[in-house]
């Protein structure tokens, strides 16, 4: 297993980065990379067969910026982009940074209703989309974009829309007017995954991306050159990994449609030395070839103690825990040279550069070391606000601190531990129970693929605990019984944390970031006890 990491301590790394001079924009970072590595491979779009050097990428971005400027796209103009992973997507992003305009990434899996919501709430003046998504335009009811404001990638019925390739051909040899660039200019309206209510548009500046890209590249503490982008570019992870490649002068490899089944096959075939690996990949059936890869490091997110160690054995690579969210970018990270000793600790690491963190009580005051509270973050480059939503912005910030909504604790050495969501709790007989804590225990039982904990109203205890169980392929309730599950919980949890109700499911509704959408589970039936096994009364309800 690779372990040749630099040993710079977190405080020293933070001082070095926070006193460094960063570029004025993401485009300027690209220009610097192209100047240093003009002929080095920049990206490869695996399924399209498209490869570019950094010099070629810069030239294409300049052409796109000239084409956009001719349409009237300039500082502050909102441009929605809806596509799978193809090179026009990052070209558009970088060109918009060149013009100080704003990209609104649109999830390619969205329904017409969701597309309309994004276009309406973002006030998008232009839309760039792949031809396959044109039918969404016919379904719009409350949003109307002039055909001349729609740019179509690929072939398809245009109906007055502009064609991407035609615009690029016409702009060859031209340059957009010079635009003063500021790191404080908004570059993205990045929609959250919407775990509660409608998605909110986070106003993310160029500085947000520069702080995230530069610091996360330093977290790796080793020289990486081949970055697998196993995430769609409309998600922030895909954009962040491109910045990692840019900062390091490496190459980013994009599958058109990322997926858990192809993930490790791609990584091995392409000899990638870095990836950000979601737990859905780990949950794929193990292959004898899993460890046959060139990975030096993988970023992971909220792996349980046992799965973290098993992941490292299975894929023969260290998994570096990272805590972040759309609003804050990076919050904490595990120093690479500490991964081995901290594996199995369930810690997400220490505070990231450009960030301060506080564990706060309900009144916003810091709690003692080791006590549980809400993780709050402040620092350079956080979201400016939720676009068009002053109420949500006011609720998210308190005394200058962004409230993550995550319950956490920090130990005496500064290592942080995420315990659950502030609203993802069950209050049973006066005890606050973290749903995530119970879910982690459930997932360690052989035969359980995934689990979700929700509260059930109860006249006597206030709330009872219900466990939704998704069994692994080939396992059925006759072998993984409620009794076996409850016994397992009883051996790993205090009695008041053991679920009372158990219901089996074939699958879970998931958010964009692969989190269970518990609001849908809660809304499925008026009485959540129906269809569940009652462990206390030993009956099916």
Regions found by a protein language model. Give the residues of each.
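AMP-binding/adenylate-forming catalytic core of the ANL superfamily
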Residues: 110-116, 127-129, 267, 275, ...
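Conserved structural elements of the adenylate-forming
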Residues: 58-66, 183, 188, 202-223, ...
